[in-house]
UniProtKB/Swiss-Prot annotation:
Protein name: 5-methyltetrahydropteroyltriglutamate--homocysteine methyltransferase
Species for this entry: Flavobacterium johnsoniae (strain ATCC 17061 / DSM 2064 / JCM 8514 / BCRC 14874 / CCUG 350202 / NBRC 14942 / NCIMB 11054 / UW101) (Cytophaga johnsonae)
Binding-site residues for L-homocysteine, renumbered to this chain: 445-447, 498, 613
Function: Catalyzes the transfer of a methyl group from 5-methyltetrahydrofolate to homocysteine resulting in methionine formation.
Catalyzed chemical reaction(s): 5-methyltetrahydropteroyltri-L-glutamate + L-homocysteine = tetrahydropteroyltri-L-glutamate + L-methionine
Family the entry assigns: Belongs to the vitamin-B12 independent methionine synthase family.
Amino acid sequence: MKTNNLGYPRIGSNRELKKASELYWAGKISADELLDAGKEIRLKNWYLQSEAGVDLIPSNDFSFYDQVLDLTLAVGAIPQRYHELAKSNSSLDLYFAMARGSQKNGQDVVAMEMTKWFDTNYHYIVPEFTKNQKFELFSEKILNEFKEANAVGIKTKPVLIGPVSYLLLGKEKEEGFNRIDLIDALLPVYFEILEKLQIENAEYIQLDEPFLALNLTDKERNVFTKVYNEINVRFPKLKIVLANYFDCFGENLETALALPVDTFHLDLVRCQLQLDDILESGKLASNVNLSLGVVDGRNIWKNDFKKSLELIKKAADALGENRILLAPSCSLIHSPCDLDLETNDQTLTPEIKQWLAFAKQKINEVVLLKQFASGEVNPKNSADYERNVIANENRKTSKLIHNNEVKARTAGITAADDKRKSAFASRRKSQIKALNLPLFPTTTIGSFPQTTEVRSWRAKFKKGELTTEQYNDLIEKETEAAIRFQEETGIDVLVHGEFERNDMVEYFGEQLDGFTFTKNGWVQSYGSRCVKPPVIYGDVSRPNPMTVKWSKYAQSLTSKWVKGMLTGPVTILQWSFVRNDQPRSETCTQIALAVRDEVVDLEKAGIKIIQIDEPAIREGLPLRKEEWAKYLDWAVKAFRISASGVNDDTQIHPHMCYSEFNDIIQNIADMDADVITIECSRSQMELLDAFANFKYPNEIGPGVYDIHSPRVPSSKEMVRLLEKASAVIPVDQLWVNPDCGLKTRHWNETKKALIEMVAAAQEMRKAVENPVTE
């Protein structure tokens, strides 16, 4: 029996990668210094896993931005718009330009599209493919990192995304072909990579093929068969670990089991039943091993050793111990680094802390499970086992978790609780009369730049270095400055800027019962952006208003409307580490009731427009389409519960991003929002087609510029996007806004971009009022 790890967090236990990357982008450190910071993180990760006793330690799981972008560079799939830039820049700067866009030395290129990695809160950079796409080995990162580990005496298992999933992760940038047909052009580059690794004596290679958990066409399944047979013919001595995670193989199981690989990795956290399916199928070849993903790589709860050992015993009895590998369910990039860094009992109480395990602890759990399953019992690990059993039993019975009032309120929800008082057509008349907004009303999506100064105020306040009065005074001044800037710029519906908020989920979690927090529980969201998800450990309720004070203050400063800003129940759920002792739908409904109470209180305080951010509704979709309807039913209902306690003339704005809407457009309509704002600019308004084809009746604010890039777009660019939008959506339904909140941007670029955005809206109004006649 061996231990296997699929990937380890690359941000560094103290977010060293974030700090180094941002210093490099700001021109404050050299490329060599950034590369050294990356190397130091890799070495620490390898040593940690080696010392813990991991047999198959991954390499190439490190990335300066994103593992999919790494592979795009490795196989030379560099979009045409970066070719000129590639001539005059290092491959590192080319890489970051592809991720972030670039406006340097007279060059102006937009970033590649970014979207969610399956149903996680990680984002990847979407590969772009053309009909005659050429591939060539461009970067040897995979080989270099394998050699780097070898140089310090650590034999690793290189990890790369498998060729079929890589193509399926991408997007066709022109019509007339299917990206899966590029497989014959792509495979030779994979062969070249595998050849180089074989020459360097690599024994195991992990190929991640998570699309095997999705609904595939017969053609796509046939491509899997072709690819892995070819790899086996060319590299019969390489031990290929084929990793599937996040769900079952489903109808792809027969195809998968026929592939000539050394080991199949199974996610037994998300899909425990597949172990029985495989063992009972009789189709697992006698020379093929199973990697059992029994430790949850995506959540932070301590493993239940008793349950895991039952699964391991079942597999070992059927196949023999020598054919079993033990592993986390997926890469640990979705877990925080180290629970040992949580030393503040006020932030995370000892009772809750004993229920948790982060990446370092999960590695130890995998190693301990191997020892127990192999009969390697000693006094130390016996004590570890006993502690695990006690912690899990304690969690089941803890009074911290259960609130009977919350359970009763949730059970008492009626059909009327998730419906507005009137239909949209009637509400719209009330809102037009009450709000009196122009055509193409302009707004932003909530947050404004959080400067180092603003963040330092919050840190000082938390440390007790600022009094509540001093802190509030500073936030008031910053809020007033934001209101005045928006008024001067000519924005129609203002926001208060969210300067008091650390994170759009954490801020609410800090004020809700049933949530707790970590001090250092950071995980990578994209690039250098890390998030510290709250921990939902028990029943959720709202003891006090959460946002009313600041929204009310901002509204008192201006005669224009100020939006209330809330995070929706599904997003709070999706972006938290969620308790695993009850259905997610039940936890979501509890959160929805808490948000509903806040919406009602905002309305009472005179706030007539309330944004409820739900960027995560689509990412919560199960990977398999046959399970979508059940999820969408409770997710949409939770949103409606949160939004339906107000009068007709109060306008509800959900904000959604990273979304393809075609296949869930009916469910979006079922949310019954007054105005939906969506991320649109990177896709050049393609996303609007779904709304147009559906004849979506409500109002829409398609994002007109990409806030994930520092690039400042011109008003002409935004006018072009608005013209595209107005070609498919009636002009009296269109709003004008950025893609997303502006928290991570700098004030300089934000001000310039919003001035351009308002100019674009004004130009569109003129065009409608004075149409050009042929």
